[in-house]
Amino acid sequence: YIKFLVYASSAGVFGQKDHYYPFPETHYGAYKLAVEGVARAYFNEAGISSVGIRPYVIYGPGREVGGTAGVTLACKAAKQGNSYTVNFSGKAGFVYVQDVVNLVKMSISQIPSGALTFNINGITTDVSHFINLIKKNIPLASIGIKGNPLSIVDEIRGNEPSNIFKKFKYTSLEDGIKRTIDFY
């Protein structure tokens, strides 16, 4: 039977009101928060421990689908000499995909007790700065931004994975963007 589970929640559990406490303002965020409640119930009723991961904007090799995949697609387009427009603006937390993989591996190897959730904010910056870092690697890149900021606070705080997993660290934007460009 199942003794431990790692699952993907989302920074979408946060709305635009609070950096620390979930207050979803979309059906997607409300659903993800409900799943976290189900995980707590399974721990309380059946002793099944879990780790829920709430990533903000994941970018990197393979992240090519979803509403926030635009920054990865911008890296790919720049490398291939194509123009691209990222479909959201403003500040957000950017998480390199390997950081999420590393957290899953740490969770599986240490199997903490309880129904834990971790906010995976990554590095907070403006989308325009992310684009400038792409252009630092590929000066002739034709990348634009069009769209509104995400419907989540610009930075999620608290419940850091490093509180439990001492070796957990975020990849710098410079390194993550370079690795993403190199992949394509």
Where in this protein do the model-derived segments appear?
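Flexible, glycine-rich beta-alpha linker
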Residues: 14-16, 26-27, 51-69
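Active-site loop of short-chain dehydrogenase/reductase
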Residues: 1-5, 47-49, 115
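Short-chain dehydrogenase/reductase
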Residues: 24-36, 64, 68-69, 93-94
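Conserved Rossmann-fold NAD(P)-dependent oxidoreductase catalytic core, especially the SDR/UDP-sugar
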Residues: 1-27
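Active-site Tyr-X1-5-Lys
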Residues: 25-54, 79-80
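A conserved pocket-lining segment of Rossmann-fold NAD(P)-dependent short-chain dehydrogenase/reductase
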Residues: 50-58, 73-95
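Hydrophobic alpha-helix immediately C-terminal to the catalytic Tyr-X-X-X-Lys motif of short-chain
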Residues: 30, 34, 38-42, 70, ...
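C-terminal substrate-binding subdomain of Rossmann-fold SDR/epimerase-dehydratase oxidoreductases
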Residues: 82, 86-184
